Amino acid sequence: MATTISAVILAGGQAKRMAGLDKGLQLLQGKPLYQHCLQRLTNQVSSISINANRHQAIYQQSGVEVFGDELEDFQGPLSGILTALERANTDFVLFVPCDSPFLPLNLCEKLQSAVENSKSLLAYANDGEREHPAFSLLSTQLKLPLRVYLQSGHRQMLQFFRQHKAISVDFSLQKQAFVNMNTLQDIEKYQNIYA
């Protein structure tokens, strides 16, 4: 039976490095950052939703399902990941951050191949120099261990990933795909660069 995969754009953070502005809604080349992600995911998975804790009505204008973290107080990306895994009706969920408008068009394909070949429950991207755990594919079987991990007060993604024998997948030929917009200056820098 074929593995089923849905995708979630993680837009639930506080954006402290962007003066609290909602990162996913900042414009790059006339389009909100999250819409760049949505466009690049469309041909990779059958269904996409957005994890957002603010401005949900604006995100809903895109026509996709929007949901907030079940856990309160902005507990980091793992909180959004947990909520997504608990809501999912697919075998795996692909996660991407909302501030990465150039994400790889073959992200799902490569991560899926890695989990299938290794029989792992989890894979994430690296660019040959840095690990990028926010670009990850997780089995919904991890929802209970993740809930326990968060209830224990832990928040580090890579620590959880390593505990569950995550596969780090090499995207070193696509380094630029992992550029993210952490500040308004980052967005300004890339206004005239096209993916």
UniProtKB/Swiss-Prot annotation:
Gene Ontology biological-process annotations: bis(molybdopterin guanine dinucleotide)molybdenum biosynthetic process
Disulfide bonds, paired cysteine numbers: none
Catalytic activity entry: Mo-molybdopterin + GTP + H(+) = Mo-molybdopterin guanine dinucleotide + diphosphate
Keyword terms: Cytoplasm, GTP-binding, Magnesium, Metal-binding, Molybdenum cofactor biosynthesis, Nucleotide-binding, Transferase
One Pfam family this sequence matches: NTP_transf_3
Keyword Transferase applies: yes
GO terms for MF: GTP binding; metal ion binding; molybdenum cofactor guanylyltransferase activity
Localization of this protein: Cytoplasm
Gene3D superfamilies, alphabetized: Spore Coat Polysaccharide Biosynthesis Protein SpsA, Chain A (3.90.550.10)
EC category name: transferase
EC number of this enzyme: 2.7.7.77
Cofactor(s) needed: Mg(2+)
GO cellular component, one term: cytoplasm
Binding site for Mg(2+): 99
Binding locations of GTP: 10-12, 23, 51, 69, 99
Entry keyword annotation includes Cytoplasm: yes
Domain remark text: The N-terminal domain determines nucleotide recognition and specific binding, while the C-terminal domain determines the specific binding to the target protein.
NCBIfam families: molyb_mobA
Protein family membership: Belongs to the MobA family.
Role noted for this protein: Transfers a GMP moiety from GTP to Mo-molybdopterin (Mo-MPT) cofactor (Moco or molybdenum cofactor) to form Mo-molybdopterin guanine dinucleotide (Mo-MGD) cofactor.
Quaternary context: Monomer.
This protein's name: Molybdenum cofactor guanylyltransferase
Native organism taxonomy: Bacteria, Pseudomonadati, Pseudomonadota, Gammaproteobacteria, Pasteurellales
Gene: mobA
